[in-house]
Amino acid sequence: RFWHPILVSALSEDLDRISVSAAAQVVRESMKSPEARHMGVPALPLTDLYNAAGDYVRARGGTLHFRCPVESFSADASQVRVRVRDQQDPKRFDYLVVALPFDALDSLLPSTAESTPIREKISHFENSPITGIHLWFDRQISELDHAVLLDRTIQWMFHKSRLQPIRTQGDNGRSSGSYIELVVSSSKTLIEKSRAEIVDLALAEVREFFPAAREANLVKSTVIKEVNATYSPRPGIDAFRPTPVTAWPPVFLAGDWTATGWPATMEGAVRSGYLAAEAVTQAAGVPGHFLSPDLPASGLMRLFT
């Protein structure tokens, strides 16, 4: 009962489909030290985080191109040619890092023999869905910033109007309502349900756990189904997770589904980016090390590391 929401949320898969190694990694990391158990929750909209990352790139001479989908690439030992939709001539680069989900990568790979090994690995992957339910109430329903809902379909509640305060007119500039986000990982049972059915289910469970919600009026609701949210960490899948290095010397892979040593979490995604960057610098002859060291074990956990 304790580990179910933790493992399903971290791995986005049902317990009977999760590999033992993936589950053990989550348990080991969460118990390694007090710092490892801390949960980070964004205190500002994710768009602001992304914009800050873009500013960082631009400040260092980089350029960001939006709304220009890449249709294909080809490469030799020293150069990559990238074909962008609606542009006649391919763009040329010294190196290419492909940071895409595994199914999107499959459609981008060249129709050459070099693509066969990575395509064979991709064929073993399956997706797992995550559903987010956003509810706006006309009054405060809880003083909690976040909560776990045990033994229910809803796994997590994030009180967004407390975590990211929305300033409104009146009430001394503070929002008088509640905006909450509910998260269901491995949400296979919700994919075929209608938006109305999901909202009704969510309301029933929220009102069960938060009595103040029973008197609140629902102002607005949104349901977001990420059908292909993460890869499924089934037994044996680690053997098919690729490293950043590909059959094309100047082309590298990144993504939470690659061989990071972590499951499909934000930490795993960040690690994949660091590993890809290290591979690029290695190929360029200026090796760099960017991967942050794991937190050291403390207390009794030092006996098991």
Predicted regions and their residues:
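Active-site/ligand-binding neighborhood in enzyme catalytic cores
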Residues: 1-75, 79-80, 92
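Flavin (FAD/FMN) cofactor-binding core of flavoprotein oxidoreductases
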Residues: 10-11, 200-246, 297-298
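Short, hydrophobic alpha-helical segments
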Residues: 57-60, 94, 277-285
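General small-molecule cofactor/ligand-binding pocket signal
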Residues: 63-67, 91, 219-222, 252
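Mid-domain catalytic core of redox enzymes
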Residues: 68-213, 224
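FAD-binding beta-loop-beta segment adjacent to the flavin cofactor pocket
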Residues: 163-173, 226-253, 257-260
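A conserved FAD-binding loop/helix module that cradles the flavin
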Residues: 259-280, 284
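Active-site-proximal substrate-binding core of FAD-dependent oxidoreductases
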Residues: 281-305
